[in-house]
């Protein structure tokens, strides 16, 4: 089964469990609204790619890890869009959850998706409890403080911001989780896979900064120019467009070089190359 089918099937099963017969109907429908359409599902696809490169001897556990990670990511988007943070009106081409359902339900939706992510891992633990425990730990570390997406959001409240630490926590954290969890699910050590995740995450953030500066809202599927409006730290402000484009090229080259030795190393390198082609904004593609 293709990665996309595996991810969507496991995601649908997780959401269906959260929409049980006694669930409040508005919150139940908000759960599905928050995770669909799924976009590129970049993080879970990366996780399954690493697991496959490492042999993927427990595909059910890999699927659970992929969905747990994506649920956390979707939760972070719901919370990021709230009025107290970005106050965004559009996400993935449709009204944000708080616009469609209300702010209280958006908060509950994000909270529910976070809990659901860890529940998915707990339910998958019977066959490989040690691996499952490592997966829970890896995901928790990259979700909370001091190195997770919560820390990334927290950096935006600081007067002095370390751009590298900010990017590593806000965006890199879940990419590190993706590569490490893919390895763990297949029985490999997590630590050697941190650099690959960090580099892919930084590349994604720099590319996102370039898109935010250069693309319009229709192209993005969300409001453009948000970094400038909210005075957020970003690579374009730090390096300029040309400098950010060069930085992106360097990061992507380093990502391929950082892939640890594994049976599917060549396949994974090709996946990273294809991913690079997708994330580079058209306006700067010729420069990288």
Swiss-Prot record:
GO molecular function: geranylgeranyl diphosphate synthase activity; metal ion binding
Listed EC numbers: 2.5.1.29
Catalytic activity, as annotated: isopentenyl diphosphate + (2E,6E)-farnesyl diphosphate = (2E,6E,10E)-geranylgeranyl diphosphate + diphosphate
Residues that, per the record, bind Mg(2+) 2: 80, 86
Pathway participation: Isoprenoid biosynthesis; geranylgeranyl diphosphate biosynthesis; geranylgeranyl diphosphate from farnesyl diphosphate and isopentenyl diphosphate: step 1/1
Cofactors required: Mg(2+)
Top-rank taxon: Bacteria
Note describing how the cofactor binds: Binds 2 Mg(2+) ions per subunit.
Binding site residues for Mg(2+) 1: 80, 86
TM regions (residue ranges): none
Pfam families, alphabetized: polyprenyl_synt
Keywords: Carotenoid biosynthesis, Chlorophyll biosynthesis, Isoprene biosynthesis, Magnesium, Metal-binding, Photosynthesis, Transferase
Gene Ontology biological-process annotations: carotenoid biosynthetic process; chlorophyll biosynthetic process; geranylgeranyl diphosphate biosynthetic process; photosynthesis
Positions contributing to isopentenyl diphosphate binding: 43, 73, 92
Binding site for (2E,6E)-farnesyl diphosphate: 91, 170-171, 205
General function of this protein: Catalyzes the condensation of farnesyl diphosphate (FPP) and isopentenyl diphosphate (IPP) to yield geranylgeranyl diphosphate (GGPP) needed for biosynthesis of carotenoids and diterpenes.
PANTHER family linked: FARNESYL DIPHOSPHATE SYNTHASE
Family: Belongs to the FPP/GGPP synthase family.
Protein known as: Geranylgeranyl diphosphate synthase
């Amino acid at each position: 089964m293709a990665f996309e089918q595996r991810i969507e099937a496991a995601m649908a099963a997780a959401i269906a469990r959260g929409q049980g017969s006694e669930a409040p109907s508005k919150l139940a429908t908000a759960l599905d609204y928050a995770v669909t359409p799924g976009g590129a599902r970049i993080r879970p696809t990366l996780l399954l790619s690493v697991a496959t490169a490492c042999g993927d001897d427990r595909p059910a556990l890999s699927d659970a890890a992929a969905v747990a990670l994506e649920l956390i990511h979707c939760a972070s988007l719901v919370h990021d869009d709230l009025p107290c943070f970005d106050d965004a009106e559009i996400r993935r081409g449709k009204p944000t959850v708080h616009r469609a359902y209300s702010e209280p339900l958006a908060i509950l939706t994000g909270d529910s998706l976070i809990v659901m992510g860890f529940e998915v891992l707990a339910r998958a633990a019977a066959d490989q409890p040690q691996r499952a425990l490592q997966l829970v730990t890896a995901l928790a570390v990259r979700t909370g403080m001091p190195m997770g997406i919560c820390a990334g959001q927290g950096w935006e409240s600081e007067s002095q911001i370390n751009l590298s630490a900010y990017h590593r926590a806000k965006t890199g954290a879940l990419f590190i989780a993706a590569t490490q969890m893919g390895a763990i699910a297949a029985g490999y050590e997590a630590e050697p896979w941190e650099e690959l995740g960090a580099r892919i995450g930084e590349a994604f953030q720099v590319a996102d900064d370039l898109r935010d500066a250069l693309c319009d809202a229709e192209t993005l599927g969300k409001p453009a120019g948000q970094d400038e409006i909210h005075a957020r730290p970003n690579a374009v402000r730090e390096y300029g467009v040309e400098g950010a484009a060069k930085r992106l090229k360097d990061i992507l080259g380093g990502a391929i070089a950082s892939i640890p030795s594994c049976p599917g190393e060549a396949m994974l390198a090709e996946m990273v190359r294809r991913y690079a082609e997708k994330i580079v904004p058209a306006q700067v593609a010729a420069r990288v």
